[in-house]
């Protein structure tokens, strides 16, 4: 292997060109991801299902495509949300939704009470639309999964996006990389060597 690398190591200019080529590939992928994020208005426009809580609708390893430009999430809609303080996306279905003017005065009081908890004294309320979620394969709703003191999800603060499409099983690669960190290093190493060995 070192014998194959020797010609490139002896030619710094060509080696630098190959390194820049590899950096270009990575930066192009990054810019593509950012562009997709802006278009979908989602910080994570593509996510992978990590558990079986949404079976049979989605299986572990399915790749989901999200859209986050709708002001509301209706009952029955499948959304992806992040729990405050955690960075693990959860894919579950909306089973209750509360919005301004919906559900009567009782629901509105619940919204205002939750807004006070979330925004704190002296801050304007960011609450616009709230919902309760549940996994199709779960017995109970997601109240126990939410942050301490949180009864509902807020559309603007917690929701990453609504599911608009999916590809089965493709995300298993991501799960394998997450569960085996050493595989990331090996994969990046292989990609780097392949780029370095490309002849112009």
Curated annotation (Swiss-Prot):
Transmembrane segments: 16-33
Glycosylation, residue list: 41
Root EC class: hydrolase
Lumenal side: 34-200
Disulfide bonds: none
Catalytic site: 53, 92, 142
Molecular function terms from GO: serine-type endopeptidase activity
Keyword Cell division in record: no
EC number: 3.4.21.89
GO biological process, one term: signal peptide processing
InterPro entries, per database record: LexA/Signal_pep-like_sf (IPR036286), Pept_S26A_signal_pept_1_Ser-AS (IPR019756), Peptidase_S26 (IPR019533), Peptidase_S26B (IPR001733)
Stretches of the chain found on the membrane's Cytoplasmic side: 1-15
Region annotation C-terminal short (CTS) helix: where it falls in the sequence: 186-197
Region of interest (Disordered), residue spans: 101-131
Reaction equation(s) it catalyzes: Cleavage of hydrophobic, N-terminal signal or leader sequences from secreted and periplasmic proteins
UniProt entry tagged with the keyword Transmembrane helix: yes
Extent of Basic and acidic residues compositional bias: 103-119
Keywords of the record: Endoplasmic reticulum, Glycoprotein, Hydrolase, Membrane, Protease, Signal-anchor, Transmembrane, Transmembrane helix
Subcellular location: Endoplasmic reticulum membrane
Membrane association type: Single-pass type II membrane protein
Cellular component, GO annotation: signal peptidase complex
Function: Catalytic component of the signal peptidase complex (SPC) which catalyzes the cleavage of N-terminal signal sequences from nascent proteins as they are translocated into the lumen of the endoplasmic reticulum. Specifically cleaves N-terminal signal peptides that contain a hydrophobic alpha-helix (h-region) shorter than 18-20 amino acids.
Similarity section: Belongs to the peptidase S26B family.
Entry domain remark: The C-terminal short (CTS) helix is essential for catalytic activity. It may be accommodated as a transmembrane helix in the thinned membrane environment of the complex, similarly to the signal peptide in the complex substrates.
Record's subunit section: Component of the signal peptidase complex (SPC) composed of a catalytic subunit SEC11 and three accessory subunits SPC1, SPC2 and SPC3. The complex induces a local thinning of the ER membrane which is used to measure the length of the signal peptide (SP) h-region of protein substrates. This ensures the selectivity of the complex towards h-regions shorter than 18-20 amino acids. SPC associates with the translocon complex.
Protein name: Signal peptidase complex catalytic subunit SEC11
Originating organism: Arthroderma gypseum (strain ATCC MYA-4604 / CBS 118893)
Gene: SEC11
């Amino acid at each position: 292997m070192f014998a194959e690398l020797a010609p490139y190591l002896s030619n710094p200019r060509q080696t630098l060109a190959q390194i820049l080529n590899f950096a270009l590939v990575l930066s192009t992928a990054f810019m593509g991801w950012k562009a997709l994020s802006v278009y979908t208005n989602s910080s994570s426009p593509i996510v992978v299902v990590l558990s079986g809580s949404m079976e049979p609708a989605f299986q572990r390893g399915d790749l989901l495509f999200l859209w986050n430009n709708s002001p509301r999430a209706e009952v029955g809609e499948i959304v992806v949300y992040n729990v405050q303080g955690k960075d693990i996306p959860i894919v579950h279905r909306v089973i209750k939704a509360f919005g301004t003017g919906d559900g009567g005065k009782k629901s509105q009081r619940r919204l205002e009470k939750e807004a006070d908890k979330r925004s704190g004294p002296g801050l304007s309320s960011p609450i616009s639309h709230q919902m309760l979620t549940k996994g199709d394969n779960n017995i109970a709703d997601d109240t126990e999964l939410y942050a301490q003191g949180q009864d509902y999800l807020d559309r603007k603060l917690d929701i990453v996006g609504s599911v608009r499409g999916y590809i089965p099983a493709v995300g298993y690669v991501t799960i394998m990389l997450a569960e085996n960190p050493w595989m990331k290093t090996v994969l990046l190493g292989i990609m780097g060597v392949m780029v370095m060995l490309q002849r112009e």
